[in-house]
Design a protein with these regions (language model features):
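Non-cysteine beta-strand/loop elements that form the S-adenosyl-L-methionine
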Residues: 14
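Active-site microenvironment of metallo-dependent hydrolases
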Residues: 154-163
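Alpha/beta enzyme core
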Residues: 1-11
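Shared catalytic-loop signature of beta/alpha-barrel
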Residues: 8, 17-32, 39-136, 140
């Protein structure tokens, strides 16, 4: 790793399977390390920050406990100065909408990327327009997540809320 040229736009995402291995590698290389699968809870991110264990975190909405928990994790990462990838392990149009919304709440200097997970599945679950302007993705400006669920695919709602 240390023979890579300095300044190379390259990171190691989840390079090792254990905490100990990641921390050991972090101390032996100047290549930035992004944690994801081992950073699922607030406590994990706090521990990584306290040990100077990374340059960034991959926030996976479903694995990390949903949008509310990811918001708190995002705040910890911003306080630690970490770059973040906002993603999910797999996705749908609805999951993608949530990813985009969370990604938009990050200060741009901390946003590494937003993963477009829509191509990971064959079934389209919702419709919505997502614009890319100057390299940045933006969510629809309509209510909620900004997408219209395809009820012919998902079935009728079990419960709905109205104003």
């Amino acid at each position: 790793m240390n023979i890579l040229p300095s300044g190379l736009d390259f990171v190691l995402e989840a390079p090792c399977s254990t905490w100990r291995e990641n921390l050991s590698l972090r101390r032996r290389t100047s290549v930035p390390i992004i944690w994801d699968e081992l950073a699922l809870y607030e406590e994990d991110i706090l521990q990584i920050a306290s040990e100077d264990g990374a340059e960034g975190i991959g926030l996976k909405i479903s694995k990390n406990g949903g949008l509310t928990k990811c918001r708190r994790q995002r705040d910890i990462c911003v306080a630690a100065g970490y770059t973040m990838s906002v993603q999910d392990t797999t996705g749908s149009d609805i999951a993608f909408a949530a990813i985009v919304h969370l990604g938009q709440t990050l200060p741009k200097k901390y946003l590494r990327c937003i993963l477009d997970c829509r191509d990971m599945v064959d079934v389209k679950t919702a419709d919505g327009d997502f614009d890319v302007v100057n390299g940045f993705l933006s969510a629809p400006k309509t209510f909620g997540l900004g997408v219209t669920p395809r009820l012919d695919v998902l079935g009728e709602p079990i419960l709905s809320y109205k104003n």
